[in-house]
Each structure stands twice: as structure tokens, then as C-alpha cells.
Regions:
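NAD(P)-dependent short-chain dehydrogenase/reductase
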Residues: 1-51, 58
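Residue-level detector of short coil/turn "hinge" positions at structural boundaries
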Residues: 6, 141-142
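Residue-level signal for the nucleotide or nucleotide-sugar donor/cofactor binding architecture
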Residues: 24-28, 53-59, 89, 129, ...
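Short, surface-exposed alpha-helical segments at coil->helix boundaries
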Residues: 31, 92-95, 128
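Mid/C-terminal beta-alpha module of Rossmann-like enzyme folds, strongest
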Residues: 37, 46, 62-119, 159-167
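Conserved C-terminal active-site "lid" loop/helix of NAD(P)H-dependent oxidoreductases
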Residues: 58, 115-140
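Amphipathic alpha-helical segments that line or abut small-molecule/effector binding pockets
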Residues: 59-70, 146, 150-153
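Amphipathic terminal alpha-helices
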Residues: 131-135, 143-171
Length: 171
């Protein structure tokens, strides 16, 4: 308040596709509907295909946090949190991207089975976001969800577990 501390806060969008095993978080399916099919595993989506939510890649999130940390107070432009950029997509758009990038066999590994608890939680989340202040810092969301999937695949291919993580994907 008095300017003695230069504190900053950034709101993160849902990071998709997150590596690793599925977890109990309500948002876990956003990664699971991409990660598991690419690994040759089935995935159950607990919400309807028309659910919309802002997502981003792990790399864009890390870049955003570094930029917020390193920018000047003037460039940061305020004392309140800023939204890091996110791509506003529906679950259906995510699955369409999966099919374009990895093919219909991979996409077919995703089925829908509504989970009322998760659907109820997700229904109260933002359907989209804007990031005007982050854009002024040179941060922008990925242009398409295809880009996010391709980045996840590239990250997996460079990692030690590529064979396991991508066993259901043929380039």
C-alpha cells in the first residue's frame, strides 16, 4: 500500500496438457482427455462437450510468471493481480484439435460420462478470460489448441518417458 514492497500476483489459467498421472482435482480431465489418449489409454470426460474454459500450456505459464517477475513496476501497471493469457476453448474444440493432430483413433479413446460433482464445480468457473495487461507485457495465449497439443507432444518426445507418454500416438 505504501510502496515499500513490490508484490505481484498473476492469475493462472488451467494448464493443459499437464504431464504425469491423473489426479483428483476437478480440472484434471482438461489434461486427461488429451494426455491419456496420446498414451494409448481411454479417458472419460465428466462434463458436456460445450463446456468452455480458458486454458494454456505449461510453457506459456512459465514464460508468463518469469515476465511478471522481471518486468518493471511501470510495465506491470497496477497493484492488483493480472490474468496470464489463456485460450478460451470448449471441450469439443479440444477434442477436435486432438483428432486433427493425432487422428480419429486417438480421439475415439475419449468418452463422455457426466459426473455431477465435477460438472457442478466446473459450471461455476470462468467460461473465458481476457488478459489486456499481460498482453501489454508481450504475453499472448496460444493461437489454437492444436498448438498446445503439439507443444505437449514435443515436450514428451524430448523427455525420458516418451515411449510411455506417447505410445498411442503415431506421428
Amino acid at each position: 500500500r505504501k510502496g515499500y514492497i513490490d508484490g505481484r500476483s498473476a492469475r493462472l489459467m488451467t494448464v493443459t496438457v499437464r504431464p504425469g498421472k491423473p489426479n483428483g482435482a476437478a480440472s484434471s480431465f482438461f489434461s486427461g482427455i488429451i494426455r491419456e489418449p496420446l498414451a494409448g489409454e481411454p479417458s472419460v470426460c465428466p462434463v458436456s462437450p460445450d463446456v468452455s474454459h480458458p486454458v494454456t500450456s505449461a510453457g506459456a505459464t512459465v514464460d508468463g510468471l518469469i515476465t511478471v517477475f522481471e518486468c518493471s513496476r511501470e510495465a506491470y501497471g497496477g497493484r492488483t493481480a493480472l490474468n496470464l493469457p489463456g485460450l478460451n476453448v470448449t471441450v469439443q474444440e479440444m477434442l477436435d484439435a486432438l483428432e486433427r493432430v493425432a487422428g480419429p483413433e486417438v480421439r475415439a479413446r475419449v468418452t463422455f460420462e457426466r459426473n455431477e460433482t465435477i460438472a457442478g464445480i466446473v459450471s461455476r468457473w470462468p467460461k473465458g478470460s481476457s488478459s489486456v495487461r499481460a498482453n501489454k507485457l508481450g504475453l499472448f495465449a496460444e493461437k489454437t489448441f492444436d498448438d498446445i497439443i503439439r507443444q505437449y507432444i514435443a515436450d514428451c518426445q524430448a523427455g525420458p518417458n516418451a515411449a510411455q507418454a506417447l505410445k498411442g500416438y503415431k506421428a
